[in-house]
Amino acid sequence: WYFSNDLPNYRFLETYKPAVSSKIYNNNGDIAADFAVQKRTFVSIDEIPDFVVNAFLSAEDKNFFNHPGIDAKGITRAIFNNLQNIVSGKRLEGASTITQQVAKNFLLTSDVSLSRKVKEAILAFRIEKYLSKKRILELYLNEIYLGERAYGIASASMVYFDKSLKELSISEAALLATLPKAPSTYNPYRNLNTTLKRKDWVLARMLENNFLSKNGYEKEIKKTIVLKKRKLNFYNESLFFT
């Protein structure tokens, strides 16, 4: 009861849409410039390919469609580990489901404390009662920070591959799914080998969760990842429109 007092209002999430970046198009219909401190492009959950969703579920919350906002096993494990961490003075660890991450990203601070984790769990439980799973997933995939100033998977797809979500391969989607855990550590422009190892781990989880067949896994694990950052040109056309 103590922690449930004075919690932020979560009902605005039903209609929330992030502020997206302003884009300038050349007269061929291509993006010539993108103005924003944070790169954002909102994509409806119905427009996100299943294999992209499955990559993130495998990496972040494989039980997303079966839990009520919190993962009891994960919380039990985190509580046990955190009791040891408190004694030893180590950083507290999380057990965040996707819904808990939505609660934290939209409604709470990022400080790591037991009180915030309790509030996060309460809010996650309430959000699950108020919003559909599809809406929660849509919020998460459009708001999650994925490095290089990219927020949301559509922006990250452009930042790392210069592709729309539908153009991604499964292995490329798996690479993007490595980023929420630690965007700086797994930034492929800085730590490619580390990121590729994590990408292979995500593909293995997709196989384990029956999102990939054995043949599909073997095909994707062998694919070479080619990074391609979108380079916007202000001068290649004389006529622009917004």
Where are the regions a protein language model picked out?
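Non-catalytic, structured segments within soluble enzyme domains
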Residues: K90-T242
